[in-house]
Amino acid sequence: GANPSEYLWDNNSFWSGDSNGYHSGENSVPGHFTIDLGVTTQLTKAKIHYRPTWSFVGNNPTEIEIWGRENIENAETYPIFESLGNNVTSSPVPTSEFENAGWQLITIQAINGGGSDFAEFDIPEAPMGRYIRFRFVSTVEGNACQFIEMALHGMGAIPPN
């Protein structure tokens, strides 16, 4: 289930199979996905659920970055991951590509993916953004990444024109 917009915001943090969460596919770390918040805001807090410790933790994140932008024009970073089923092929997108495309780094978080079910953290003063990019830099086993549920909190909300 590599469809973050369908699964990560359904208020269900219980892992019940790969189809009910985001799975990056194998050989895709580091990798990223982008979401549209629908409003421009300043992120202040995040809570991210991943696979529980009683289950397989190898795909749980150990480091993530959150990036933001106010618009999506010229925001693409290359190369684009190609996937066939659960196999992903490409080389990782370097940080310089994110910066050159106008993405602003909001936060970097080290996560205990092997020893906990979720991470909750405050986000220091961040730039305003509508488009948020989650970049999973590393995972417990380094092959793939899984998220079950996410919650983001922001200060202020400016609707689109």
Language-model regions: role of each:
Residues 3-84, 115-161:
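Aromatic, loop-rich ligand-recognition surfaces of beta-strand-rich domains
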